Regions:
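PLP-dependent enzyme catalytic core of the Aspartate aminotransferase-like
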Residues: 40, 153-156, 160-172, 177-208
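PLP-dependent aminotransferase class I/II
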Residues: 43-127, 133-139
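Short, conserved catalytic or adaptor-binding loops enriched in Gly and charged residues
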Residues: 35-39, 125-126
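Conserved PLP phosphate-binding loop immediately N-terminal to the Schiff-base lysine helix
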Residues: 12-35
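A short helix->loop->beta-strand "cap" motif at the edges of active sites that frequently abuts
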Residues: 11-13, 41-42
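Residue-level recognition of strand-loop junctions within catalytic nucleotide-signaling folds
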Residues: 67-68, 100, 146-148, 189-191
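Single conserved hydrophobic/aromatic residue that forms the stacking wall/gate
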Residues: 1-10
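Conserved PLP-binding catalytic core of the aspartate aminotransferase-like
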Residues: 114-115, 119, 128-167, 184, ...
Length: 208
């Protein structure tokens, strides 16, 4: 692993956000940072939750996994001072229910749906939206469109392009907070028929 030795060189811990770890497309595998090697396990704080996968964010059910006892004790102490993000009875039972066998089966089916959605959107964008750059992801339910070339060619700003989408009912997200100066982020966690409809609307009314 190329990044091994980071803990020794920089004397730092790594806080690894793994909340999207369940969303892995067909044919791919996600490696949690702490599972890569023993060194990474000892310097990492793994943050995760069933909230994204099972839509449980309203119940407050995030948690962390810390193998290093020194780091774990420090985090536990700080957490106890604020009582921030403490679980409640509903969130505890929701978490337990989500991690039963039925939850695993449901997640497997969900990943198949997301894979189909992403593959369709990726192929459609590459075929119909000339000048829009997009990469096929290996997981999550987000797709990032780089519209730099398209906006330059058509003489409009990314803000104007975003408004075009919203005006025809395709609600997408500004990509600038995600280090994409002329980007748009699309959420593909929806029925396949709506992905088809969104792509068709964009072709007819936005990327023209």
């Amino acid at each position: 692993v190329r990044s091994r030795g980071l803990g020794d060189v920089y004397k730092r811990q790594v806080c690894s956000d793994e909340i999207h770890e369940d969303f892995v497309y067909t044919g791919f595998r996600h490696n949690v940072f702490a599972d890569i090697c023993e060194e990474f396990r000892n310097i990492s704080i793994t943050c995760t939750s069933p909230a994204k996968t099972f839509n449980l964010a309203g119940l407050v059910g995030s948690y962390h996994i810390i193998y290093n006892p020194v780091i774990r004790d420090r985090v536990k102490k700080e957490s106890s001072l604020s009582h921030y993000n403490e679980m409640n009875v509903l969130s505890m039972y929701a978490l337990i229910g989500a991690y039963q066998q039925e939850g695993y089966e449901w997640t497997d089916e969900l990943c198949k749906v997301l894979t189909k959605n992403a593959e369709y959107a990726y192929d459609y964008i590459r075929s119909h939206f000339k000048g829009v750059q997009v990469a096929m992801p290996q997981g999550t339910y987000m797709l990032l469109l780089d519209c730099t070339e398209w906006c330059r060619k058509h003489g409009i700003t990314i803000d104007e392009l975003q408004k075009r989408g919203a005006s025809i009912g395709v609600i997408w997200q500004d990509g600038r907070p995600f280090h994409s100066p002329c980007g748009i982020r699309m959420n593909l966690a929806l029925p396949f028929s709506l992905v088809e409809e969104a792509m068709e609307r964009l072709r007819k009314y936005v990327f023209v």
